[in-house]
Amino acid sequence: MLLDTGISLRRIKTGLARRALTPDDLSAVLITHEHSDHVAGLPMLLKYYKNVKVYAPQTVAHALERAAAGLEGRIVPIPVGESVALKNFTLTAFPTMHDTPESVGYVLTGKDARFGVCTDTGCVTAEMLDALAGCDAAVIEANHDVNMLRAGRYPVYLKRRILSDRGHLSNEACAQLACALAKTGVRSLVLGHLSRENNRPGLAERAVREALDGEGFSAVTLRVAPAEGDLELEVTPCCASN
């Protein structure tokens, strides 16, 4: 499966090739929302790989179908809160708080483990916490350091957008989310969607690590997803026996 397609088809193919895969091997492409940094590569992917099926929130799915002909049966709308079967997994969408008509995170449930993804949200809601609670591993957003953003070169309107409840999570907000998830049993976290302009991996990791340790969750594994290259994550049940 591929989550979002915000990069070019060439980069998608290069990334898959590092895993000895091609786009033809994809069972599904999951789309979280319609911003270009999440869908820019989708038109070319769908044009050249006719067997690729896309799963997206309803508003995004309908927009994709209107934008291009010949996609009937290849775009699958996922109503928020409902689940669909994908081979040996169950995919569930939950709403995030972002400045688009509709944006979602996903939880993928297999036979023995659950994996969640939650980025592009300006705040954390009870519904999001409920969806991610007890996941064995999750990717969560640590988009910006507030001081870097405020002192940076972004125009005022963009800073306000990012800092709003429909923008992106700061390192501090991410730390609060991490602790809340740790209380539900989540034991492996990956920080993602870091701004190149307004954050640094070390800043994000330190903010979240200190918060987790301060709340007694030093056993939680914490990693930062790189902007380039791979991060391999093995998702295993938290309660797996030795």
Q: Model-flagged regions — what are they?
A:
Residues S8-A56:
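Active-site metal-binding motif and surrounding structural segment of the metallo-beta-lactamase
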Residues A126-V224:
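Cap/insert and terminal regions of metallo-dependent hydrolase folds
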Residues V220-N242:
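Short, basic/aromatic-enriched C-terminal tail that caps enzymatic domains
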Residues A40-K50, L64-A67, N199-R206:
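Metal-dependent catalytic neighborhoods of phosphoester/phosphodiester hydrolases
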